[in-house]
Amino acid sequence: ARSFQGLVCLLFASKLGGNILKEKRLFVCQQCGAIVPKWMGRCPECGSWNSIVEDEVLPEKKLAGTYRSPQLLQDITYSEDERILTSISELDRVLGGGIVPGSLVLIGGDPGIGKSTLMLQICGNLSRTRKVLYISGEESEKQVKLRADRLGISAGNLYIMAENNMNLIETAIKELKPDVAIIDSIQTVYFPELSSGPGSVSQIREATVKSLRLSKETETAIFVVGHVTKEGSLAGPKLLEHMVDVVLYFEGERYHAYRLLRTVKNRFGSTNEIGIFEMRDRGLVEVTSPSKYLLSGKLKDAAGSAVACILEGTRPLLVEVQALVSRTGFNLPRRQTSGVDYNRAALLIAVLEKKLGYMLGQEDIYINVAGGIKVEEPGAD
């Protein structure tokens, strides 16, 4: 009798909702996006370990829309004046000449590097002539106001919203119709329809899809802030980077003043541009002559110091490379690098020993690039 009652309840529930028996769960690789039927320790497609996570699929919905007939390419017109200038020349250069209306821009970086500071400064500049909406999923309205006062941002057409529910965020953007909206961050927003928590693969994917659709429908340029993993890549599925129009990385050492804004993907401009900033107590300040700042503390004719010319994007930079060699007190010598790839430094040490005859097997070697700049240019060898 009990089993019969349970069967009746299950059939009744499926008749009413239909979602209990239709709930779909998949397993997706966060590195390559491959879908597998069950959890595996190693992805069969890309070979990465511990990258497969459980994913949840939203119930299918019928999307309403109007049919738009195809247009000839030569009949489509646009103007370069449509780009929105932020009055931050380093950022405008990286974006290819300003913000494109209706674009979706993703910016990632380490914790405390200055992503939220940069976003709030963009809001302050644009709010003088444009309508801007700043959506914070990590701070309250009062906390954002406190940070804005510290940065010296005056009141304008800047609206603040502390919200995590993506459905309410969609309603706010459609009602306010801002020129630029910022979501800080994509890992904190969620859909209540999904049982998984904020930051999961399914939540990030659905939030990105919704943001992309909103940007195209409302012609609102949307910035989304993304967290990074300990390996330095953006947290979440790789699909996140594929869907957005622009991907920016905010780099630099947290305890150094200089920051680099690097373009990884840009559908509206070059990916060979970088922006250089200096973090001060009043926020980020543009660095128009980076070589002058990077070499300002260099001592003349100092031992263990050399100046290297590297190419960051399309801009040549002069950086100071420092090296220190001392006798080791252990069986294995210590090798430590900052701003230089460790494997490349090991290769150079091997060349010095093999070709130039330097005996470095009993020496500790420390290599540092002044200013917190990361050097990847082979010409700096």
Put a short name on every predicted segment:
Residues 202-223, 227, 243-254, 353:
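Substrate-engagement module of ASCE P-loop NTPases
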Residues 350-381:
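Terminal-proximal interaction/regulatory segments of ATP-powered molecular machines
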Residues 18-24, 30, 35-105, 127-134:
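Detector for small/aliphatic-rich hydrophobic stretches
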Residues 27-33, 76-78, 109, 191-198, ...:
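Short hinge/gating elements
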Residues 116:
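Walker A/P-loop
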Residues 44-48, 52, 58-73, 77, ...:
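Conserved P-loop NTPase
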Residues 102, 110-113, 121-122, 126-210, ...:
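Conserved inter-motif catalytic segment of the P-loop NTP-binding fold
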